[in-house]
């Protein structure tokens, strides 16, 4: 349990900043407590200190399936005028792998002068790709962000794609099941939401090895090998069908 009084009691003449780190890839269930960023920000302001939120992953649009109920969006946090906030360019933001720091202009200017930036700065290609992602956000063209597009797909859409697979492969070899999935990648730990999966019939462990050799990652659930349709892009569907047919012996 971490309370705001723990922060307050730790402040002394050497304190410069109060920091909060998001639980990106784990969660503590049961009798636990942490400090809301708003309360940390207020305490920092009251003591003339900087505040820094290491968000890990950040999102902008309202998330489906109530996934954002316990997570602040980037917009909500920035409205609090944080001294500094950092988050990943990939993960929920859905762009290239990069670290993004936002906050007070004077603090950002100081960070730019740090010699470590010469080693950590990204190249022009990364910046240009990140720029295109940000443009998509500004235009609210979320379908241009593959991570968000997959996340926002309805169960009905996924069911239609799975049915197409089953019709081509054959019901004797696979079945469509309702399942639950996770965002993964250090985001929204233990937050499950609905998906549709294709159960490839056969021994699960053997199938997993064969698909992995073909560079296809599925998962084993209830001793069944599953392909999660919330992870399948339209551009790879035909190739994936060919791989499935090859592995199960239809080709």
Where are these regions (language model features)?
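Composition- and surface-driven signal marking solvent-exposed, interaction-prone regions
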Residues: 114-115, 222, 240-243
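A common structural junction motif
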Residues: 119, 212-219, 246-251
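Short acidic (Asp/Glu) and glycine-rich catalytic loops that position anionic groups and cofactors
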Residues: 56-57, 106-112, 138-147, 189-192, ...
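Short, glycine- and charge-enriched coil/turn segments that flank and shape catalytic ligand pockets
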Residues: 46, 170-172, 205, 246-251
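Conserved PLP-enzyme active-site core in the AAT-like
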Residues: 1-135
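Conserved C-terminal alpha-helix-loop-beta "cap" of PLP-dependent enzymes
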Residues: 159-235
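Conserved PLP-dependent catalytic core of the aminotransferase class-I/II
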Residues: 124-127, 131-184
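Short, low-order "capping/linker" segments at domain edges
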Residues: 232-244
